[in-house]
Amino acid sequence: MAGHSKWSQIKRTKAVVDAKRGAVFTRLGREIMVAARDGADPSGNFQLRTAISKAKAAGVPAGNIERAIAKGSGQGGDGSQLEEVRYEGYGPAGMAVLVEALTDNRNRTAADLRLAFSKNGGNLGESGCVAYLFTHRSEVSIQATAADEDRLLESLLELDADGYELLEDGTATVHGPFTTLEALQDGLRQQGWTVREWGHSWSALTSVEISEIDTARQCLKLLDALDGLDDVRSVNANLNFDQDLELQAS
C-alpha cells in the first residue's frame, strides 16, 4: 500500500511553491537594488517606492527589503553589478517575445535565454527585431466596477491618461504614457481612488491570433520557460487567443 503517497505529493507541492516564492523574492529584491542606486530614501525615489510596494504586496519580509536597499545604495555589499537588459526573439507561429532581465552576467543570461527559446520552438533575435511591435506605457490598477465608470471617465479627463479597462475582479487598469506613471497614480489617489498596483508594461501593437490548441500550448510553454529563468524580470508577447482555448492549453 502506498499510504505515504499523498504526503509525498504534498511535500513535493510545497517544495515547488517554496521554490517559486523564493524566485519571486529574489527577483523583487534585485528590482529594489537597482532602484536604490538613485537614493535609499523611498520618499524621494519613485522607482524605489514602486519596487518596495511590489515587494510588500508579494509578501517579501521587511528584512529582505532593507538589505536590498542597503546593497543597491552601496551601504551593504555590492548591488551595483546588476544591469537592466532587454532581449527580443520569436516563438511558435511567429509570436514576438520581449524579455526584460536584471543580470550581473550578460553572457550567462543570453545563453540561458537562447537555450529556452531553442528548446521550445523559438529563436533569440537581435536587438530591435520585435521591439517596434510593442509600446511601453504606464499602468495603474485601481478598485472600480462598472458602476464607477462615469466617475472614472470624469477623473481621467483631468489626468494624463489614454485609456482604461474594467475587469471582472472589481478593478480597473488605467493606461497612460510611459513618462507619466508617478503623476498618474498620484492623481488617481488625490481623486479618491484606491490604488492597488502601478508600474510600466509593454503592450503589443499587433497580435498573433492562435486558434490551434497545440500551437497555444507551445507558445505558453515557451513563455513559462522564459519566465522561470532567474535573471528574467518580465516576459511580454503579442499572443492572443480566446479564453476557452487558454483554459484548454493551460
Curated annotation (Swiss-Prot):
Which spans of this chain does the record mark as coiled coil?
Answer: none
Its domain of life reads Bacteria
SUPFAM superfamilies to which the protein is assigned, alphabetical: YebC-like (SSF75625)
Extent of the signal sequence: none
Instruction: Give compartment(s).
Output: Cytoplasm
Q: Name one GO biological process term.
A: regulation of DNA-templated transcription
Cite the entry's keywords alphabetically: Cytoplasm, DNA-binding, Transcription, Transcription regulation
State the family named in the UniProt similarity comment for this chain. Belongs to the TACO1 family.
Q: What is this protein called?
A: Probable transcriptional regulatory protein SYNW0543
Please report the organism this UniProt entry assigns to the protein. Answer: Parasynechococcus marenigrum (strain WH8102)
